[in-house]
Amino acid sequence: MAAVMAAPEAVEAPSSLLLLVVGGECGCPGLLAYVMEELERGVRSWEDVDPAVCSLDEQLKAFVSRHSATFSSIVKGQRSLHHRGETLETLVLLNPSDKSLCDELRNLLMDPAPHKLLVLAGPCLEETGELLLQTGGFSAHHFLQVLGDKEVQDALASAPAAPALTVSCPTFGDWALLGPVPGLQLRLNPPAQLPASEGLRAFLEYVAESLEPPSPFELLEPPAAGGFLRLARPCCYVFPGGLGDAAFFAVNGFTVLVNGGSNPKSSFWKLVRHLDRVDAVLVTHAGADSLPGLNSLLRRKLAEREAAAGPQGQHEERLRRLLSPALGVVFLNAREAASRLRGGEDEAVCARSLLRSLGIAPLPLQRGPQPSCPTVLFEKLGVGRLELFVLHPPPGDPAAPACALLVWQPAAPGDKVVRVLFPGRTPPARLLDGLQRLQHLPCLRRPVVTTHDLEAPSRANSQDSLASRDSARKEPVRGTVGSIANRSTVRREPALATRDQKKDTRSGPTQPTARDTRRSGPGVVNTKPRVSQNGPRAPVLAAPLTAPVAECPGEAENILESERPPAPSPTLSPAQSPPPTAPGNSPERLSLSPLRPEPAPDASPSATTPTLTTPSLPAELGSPHSTEVDESLSVSFEQVLPAGDPGLSLPLRLARRSTSPHDVDLCLVSPCEFSHRKPPPPASPGSSDSSARSQERPPETPPTSVSESLPTLSDSDPVPVADSDDDAGSESAARDPPPTPRVPPPLPDVPGICMVDPEALPPRARQPLNTTNPSRSRKAPARPSSASATPRAATVAAKTKGPAGDRNRPLSARSEPADRPGRVPLTRKPSVPKTVPKMASATRLSSGPSGRPAPLAAGSPVYLDLAYLPGGGAGHLDQNFFLRVRALCYVISGQGQRQEEGLRAVLDALLAGKRQWDLDLQVTLIPTFDSAVMHRWYEETHAQHQALGIRVLGSGSLVSMQDEAFPACKVEF
């Protein structure tokens, strides 16, 4: 607590009057005027003041001159102003958190003073009257919760007479529903009766100075040190967005900010200020719960531009203050906010005005006639492709909330495809309808999908190996120049086509740009030159391109082929690309980000990202704040546990096919309401991911067939494109010589690719490839992963059960090979996902003789890695929702009154839906706010969690960066 009222026994003459004033921080001048009017109305409505006993005017003057100020060390920005006079005790809370306000309200109710006044004035929602605080909100529901506290009830019952409590609060919304309270004389919003006085005017002026909106540089402080953070592994930062939500999704080469939260002091700022660029901003819905945090960032960007044009100050200090990430494309639908603050401005109108001043044209999100055609946000050969699927709104309803699905397909065959859902306020029925249109996609039909799994059918349909592969690659690629105008891609980063050219690019000397000098501070790990993302730049590989957003499915279908870099030929070179186009010239055209040549991932994770995934000690129930943070306190679906503890079941990292050296406890949050057991420390926490893969890699085995000797492992190989580009490239195709037949040499082993040991397989499995796995095509080579391998002892046990048990396993588990001795120590459990069917699965993928998946029935489940639950009163979530939307990690966000009222039903629906899953998958639940409903549900259903494999994390996780911690939960995939 920032300030605690003294107990009545500690003073000789306790005050007969208590005054508690709560003022929320104002983000705009118009909002400040409304708050001051509410404060004056509340003080003048206190009819219990007897002028013969207490002179309110003199007591307020004494408060202004003699009060003591306390700054909270727990809640940064919260202040408490306290003064105790002869007859009046006054406490003013400025910019408090929800917990601080509830604690002070509890102290006010338990105080024996006979007359009390509570003034609640601050930014509040027009719909419900809920006050927006620094963290969370305060509504009539929270007021009744404090009144129902056992200690408060005992104090009211023991009082000789029922104390009088006057409450001045919003006159609209749910506050009008408050009724009589036993043991308390409650008066709600009485009319103003006291006259205006000089002391009241001085009191209001002093409070107004404390509530003035801070400057953008004070609200969003610059980092203490220079340098930029590089996020090399796919991850998602879950921020406590207050009444809304805020998230930050990142892959190697592209970052996406989703919403901004309700707090003007952006919860995501302490992370993004360490980045050189935010490539995309996605606003699922416009309102007071999602845009204030984003608008604060836009105001800072505009203030930076004005400061740069102003008088020159100290050069170093000026550069440090102007340090902020560049902004890429912004997706925003609504032109008016769905929810507003009383007395405040429309956040959606404000956001569009700020974007217009910055020269950024927001782009709408709308589902096309064929929702399976995504918008490619980012694609780079050798790295991967990030796709955006719009599930909602349908065509013709641009103002509706947006629902977006991000799918990351890495280039490495053994890496996991990451699927993250951001529904915003989309109604669950429409969300399920949008997912049903995508349920045929292979990446959504299994709990675990890798790039190798997605490419297997295309390789199975090819019989001509080299000849057909080369002809399919070279001829259509030359038509990509003519199809540039048909792209729907936000950002493209080509790579050179041959390995020799790649080596020359890495080893040759390059001249760093001016922006690279900012990467020399602490935390800068990637020291290779990169092209600046803000302002003029010197292109290294190619010039930036512009392309309009796809308006029809025909344009979206050409995304893939047009974005792949062409093969080197005399008629096509990167220097011949069209010139760049300014991003704000036309709202119908989408500006591609300038090219940033990213270096290939290094062998050691520590050399590519400063974040380390380390175990964290679980905190006790109700601990006040974190006592242990790391460079990146995270949640990782990746566990390697000792074999001697069969009773401990932790969620595993289902996605990676390569065994990871990191041992991470999923309970990596502090404070953590729900304590868990902590696994033993990792054997080699400093070892790299790639080195661990190479150590666990089986010995090289000669290919047993022609198809196995031709894996698509080279990032430099051109990729086949569709026939739609043949016409555009016919002229250049005639000038190129025909490809020379060649037999490629055997390629070195790559993580995620291994050969099957024939001796370790059951007798029935020692058959030709076309009969080993009946669910795959006969021509598909068996490429099981090395990450999910099991010890030989597990293979022997499988032999005794017979091959029937293998047929009952899902495809993702059936493709796991038997392990070789020495790959995984026998004293440790392998990182194998628990995907054993509980019953005969009707949702398992099946393939016909042609290798094509069988059509799915309506209502088939969709598997995701992380999914936010629809919030903001979007609709009721029943067990059918969790039966259809199966995610390894669910996020509950939005600490609003409507959210808490239906929270218990949502949590019970999760248990009921998870109980009907046919696959035994580990599920993690991440709430972004603390709730008594969540605590009570956890205590009552904890036994079911263990049986169903559900892990509930605490809501107080912290991430440390440059010796400063901020609330967030990092989920690594």
From Swiss-Prot:
Residues 601-973 are annotated as: Necessary for interaction with RASSF1. Keywords: Apoptosis, Cytoplasm, Cytoskeleton, DNA-binding, Microtubule, Nucleus, Phosphoprotein. One of its GO terms (molecular function) is tubulin binding. Residues 645-880 are annotated as: Necessary for association with microtubules. InterPro entries: MAP1 (IPR026074), MAP1B/S_N (IPR056617), RibonucZ/Hydroxyglut_hydro (IPR036866). Expressed in ventral and dorsal horns of the spinal cord, hippocampus, cerebral cortex, molecular, Purkinje and granular cell layers of the cerebellum and in dorsal root ganglia of the PNS (at protein level). Expressed in brain, testis, heart, lung, kidney and liver. The keyword DNA-binding applies. Residues 459-468 have a biased composition (Polar residues). Residues 1-716 are annotated as: Necessary for the microtubule-organizing center localization. Residues 603-621, 703-722, 782-801 have a biased composition (Low complexity). It is found in: Nucleus; Cytoplasm, Cytosol; Cytoplasm, Cytoskeleton; Cytoplasm, Cytoskeleton, Spindle. Residues 875-973 are annotated as: Necessary for association with actin. Microtubule-associated protein that mediates aggregation of mitochondria resulting in cell death and genomic destruction (MAGD). Plays a role in anchoring the microtubule organizing center to the centrosomes. Binds to DNA. Plays a role in apoptosis. Involved in the formation of microtubule bundles. Heterodimer of a heavy and a light chain. Interacts with microtubules and actin. Both MAP1S heavy and light chains interact with microtubules. MAP1S light chain interacts with actin. Interacts with ESR1, LRPPRC, RASSF1, microtubules and VCY2. Interacts with WDR47 (via N-terminus of light chain). Interacts (via C-terminus) with GAN (via Kelch domains). Belongs to the MAP1 family. This is Microtubule-associated protein 1S. The gene is Map1s.
